[in-house]
């Protein structure tokens, strides 16, 4: 049985997460899904110009895992560009220091490990969780986890 996938640390999220070839009819568009950590690997290596070891440290993974991630990312982008496919940035196994959730029941504050614990508190298992920050990042990526009404409701009980 293989080991569970370790979550990769991600610091950047694009404002746009879908890119389509210009002038191609919608019915003819096929897409390539680029994981969030694959985009982060390309950003660190190709834009920030960090070496492989620095990139791996920032993402909190091994150098070999980093190399596998960036190879996969570059292959997907090359396929999309050469075959006229759309690029959708979505999914993956990642975590971030940018956003934390707070459990209303036990008041635990924790980092989000996407997709794993977006809706459940890891401490008590409650579904009553809200964003702990009101950052622009949260509005785009937490997808409605900042539920003020739910928080106010729980205080009134």
Curated annotation (Swiss-Prot):
Ranges in a coiled coil: none
Organism domain of life: Bacteria
Similarity comment: Belongs to the UPF0251 family.
PANTHER family assigned: PTHR37478, UPF0251 PROTEIN TK0562
Protein name, as recorded: UPF0251 protein CBO1373/CLC_1408
């Amino acid at each position: 049985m293989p080991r569970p996938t370790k979550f990769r640390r991600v610091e950047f999220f694009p404002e746009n997460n879908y890119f389509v070839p210009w002038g191609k009819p919608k019915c003819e568009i096929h897409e390539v899904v680029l994981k969030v950590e694959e985009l982060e690997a390309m950003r660190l290596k190709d834009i920030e110009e960090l070496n492989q070891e620095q990139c791996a440290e920032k993402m909190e993974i091994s150098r070999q895992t980093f190399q596998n991630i960036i190879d996969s990312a570059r292959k997907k982008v090359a396929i999309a560009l050469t075959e006229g496919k759309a690029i959708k940035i979505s999914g993956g196994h990642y975590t971030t220091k940018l956003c934390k959730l707070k459990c209303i029941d036990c008041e635990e504050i924790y980092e989000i490990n996407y997709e794993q614990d977006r809706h459940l508190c890891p401490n008590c298992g409650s579904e009553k969780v809200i964003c702990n920050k009101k950052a622009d990042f949260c509005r785009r990526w937490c997808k409605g986890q900042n539920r003020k009404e739910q928080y106010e409701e729980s205080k009134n009980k």
